[in-house]
Amino acid sequence: MKNSKSRFTLGFVLACAAITFSLAVCAHAQTVTFVYDFHASGQQSSALSVIQGTDGNLYGVAAGGAYNQGQIFQMTPTGELTTIYSFCSQPNCADGEGQEPMPILGSDGNLYGVATFGGNATGSGTFYKLTPAGQFTKLYTFCSAPGCADGQWPHGFIQGRDGNFYGTTESGGANNSGALYQLSPSGGFKVLYSFCSLPKCIDGGTSNIIQGIDGKFYGTAGKGTLGGGYLYQIARDGSFNMLYNFCLYTDVNCTSGSYPSPLVQDAKGNFFGTTAYGGVNGGGTVFEITPNYQFHMLHGFGVHNQASDPIFGITLANDGNLYGTSVDYGYDGGRLFEVTPKGVYTELYSFQCCYDPFWKPPFQATNGLLYGTTLYGPGTCCYGTIFSLENGISPLVETVPVAGKVGQSVLILGNGLTGSTSVTFNGVAAKFTVESDTYIKVAVPKGATTGIVSVATPSGTLNSNPQFVVTK
């Protein structure tokens, strides 16, 4: 498909006062490039987000496709987009339908994903595998158990340290309020926790989860004891703990904000996220929650003519800073922003009317660029775009998975890997094979400990983000 690209460069270094953009901090130049425009390319579509494959290309899901029920696409770094699978290719949409959530790259190099709808007569969604060659396999159909006790309408998911997949559903489960499930690569399924199991359903609501550095699962959801959402922990045995409660934004002095986004975690065990509303200025927050569950607000949104409503969460990039987007309901097309761990805020880009950043924070590729999507695009404002941000961030490598035992096989994604001379896990040398210029296969070496994975390439050393956790 023909690529449509437009470029906006914000060339400010020190003379920020001479530029009309409203910026909190002056720094190096940023470049936002609209890499792909669905409308200009003749597609009535918009994408949710993108991820990186072993071939260095970006993959995602979008509306449209051959049957107008969603598609999985591949996009080159230069913006050439190809549909590799259209949902509802099977009779009665047995393969699933929908344009969310995002697929992930599995430790075997295949894409894994969930389709929110379709699959069976209840239309409750599916879990699938897609090979690089485009071979589609349905691994599970939700609402296969009586009363949808296995969950209905899946959200996002992760691949755990044990190789199994873990995710949540919007509905179903024992209490018809969603469930956290485990699914093996071969399709073996079990529910670990059914939400709304506590009195008055204070544990209601579901969202995406992460696996913490301690191996337990963490997520955020609505409700809670104060009504504004909560942070929870679920162990692999299904035991549940409510760790922090957010206030309701309509309450006086709701400084923590309400309705938290999915989380990210740094190497020290701190959690970072956003709240959609509330906070000191009423327009949401970027927050940090420490390992002992102490809350710190890093930035409050909602000041007049500035960003507000950062409902999609944030990305922790390898420069140590947090990147996200805001919706700015009623003002403009949203903003792209950066917040340091110390709370220093920078507005990087203001989207024009009708753009609207989509439902995910930016994704960092191994070339150092951050990629994101918009719901709408320029001109007729009908369909979406995929954009990139160049912010002077160094290239990196990514490990898949991000944790594993000694001897376990790991994929290392990157760029310019041909001719690499060493791979180390926190300083311990590993045996490796360069499969292509964009990925390496390696086994976790004996003696390795949790820390950074480094690859010595002909152009310099590349380090991993996040750190690799060595498990027992």
Show where each model-derived region lies:
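Extracellular beta-propeller repeat domains
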Residues: 2-472
